[in-house]
């Protein structure tokens, strides 16, 4: 038995409350393990002083998730008295061991007279400790908008655009196109018809850049984009169309015209805002565009984005007031936290607590590009941007992987966090910080295969503006081209728009596409032919997904309703094709 591959801690993803009645227990093993049971019961089922031996009830665990080198076994328990005490029985071939908190024992060793067994414990299922992200997020299909690049209002004044809207080539970092809040408002019906139920706007507050990530004021809408009244009108209309609104919050750093920063730079240690920042040299050097000399801490060593001290109670209180107003007065439904892994945990806990008092259903999303377990304990972010999903999906095509490797990658993403968080992870194919999906994919066919996976995986799916029409673009700033409304009006994007709409409608109509179990099927002789199904336990249907990443066509045994397809000719799936089919569970289960 490969003991080095076996692990369990009675915390977070290994042992956690799924809801107020159920507890999930997971055990990691190597692939040599053939059976696992959990022996569990209330720790006080046989008294509390040790006069009588404790013994539990064995329950078989299921091999739930297969990774490249490991298996994760899982069981759902329903503790009658909210507590659990447990250990494991693990079998590999003819060898069986018992696993306690302090290690492994043979059955004989475990029962040795005088043995003080160190059981695993789930002490108490407190309702306040259950991770409960907002229910509405799983059902939401998001649309990310960069206001300067999405749409210019029909009667909006031409403030300071430097480029013609029709010119989307050779974009420079400081170019502006003049998009604004009125333009977004005018296109809300377009988004509703696309199937969008949530919009996420990159920053809209006062700044001298087109992206507004160097904020000068957190209370003033940038006049390039409009007014507070226009924002309220946008939110009101969006809500009337069934669309929620999320703002982008830049609290890791600010812009150099932010009044507290200006005061600190001017007055040094005498400034009441000195401790709002991390200034290491004063007066500040006047030369240089980078802070690598340590003059002060900033985002990515850029002088235009000094880092805020989110450990400071005054900074925390300031942003508590700011965000509470956004939610209370503007009826904002969600807040996305830029550079969400660099602000302090204290800041997030206190800010989250105050915002949930204003609106318990407000959605708090962190921008984190890596394993985010530390921020998803239930008292900080509700979710994070799922960059591991985007990267893992892309690697299947980049590295010419097999369907097994795609499964391993998807399973890794789905085992980073508790199950209820998987249903609200913010999934996407591209953002304003990445190469455009269709450009990265190299073909429209591959792009729609990836979009089909996005729309059939657990989480909350997001479309970056223009992704619905397969808008191309390289790395930043080329990924921020203006939305080509003229081409859309001329019908040049009809095929892509139609296919995207079908996928979104399918996701909304069939809940199993965004929650429930994933069943994989593999054929080692056809490693690039991908098959998986989405299934909710007890249902009389599954949603089967077929991707042909081979160089040859594949005959499908289709027996149900085709919900979506590209490059499907009769029952033959051509190379680069995808088919999503409503089928009977018997085809996939058993």
Predicted regions and their residues:
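Non-catalytic, glycine-rich low-complexity segments
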Residues: 1-33, 110-128, 133
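Carbohydrate-binding surface patches
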Residues: 24, 505, 521-558
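Aromatic-rich carbohydrate-binding modules that target alpha-glucans
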Residues: 31-82, 91-107
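Substrate-binding/active-site clefts of carbohydrate-active enzymes
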Residues: 140, 146-197, 204-324, 329, ...
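Hydrophobic faces of well-ordered beta-strands that scaffold small-molecule active sites
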Residues: 141-143, 199-201, 245-247, 335, ...
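Aromatic/acidic polysaccharide-binding cleft in carbohydrate-active enzymes
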Residues: 148, 160, 377-383, 423-445, ...
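Active-site-proximal helices and loops of the catalytic beta/alpha 8
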Residues: 235-243, 253, 258-268, 324, ...
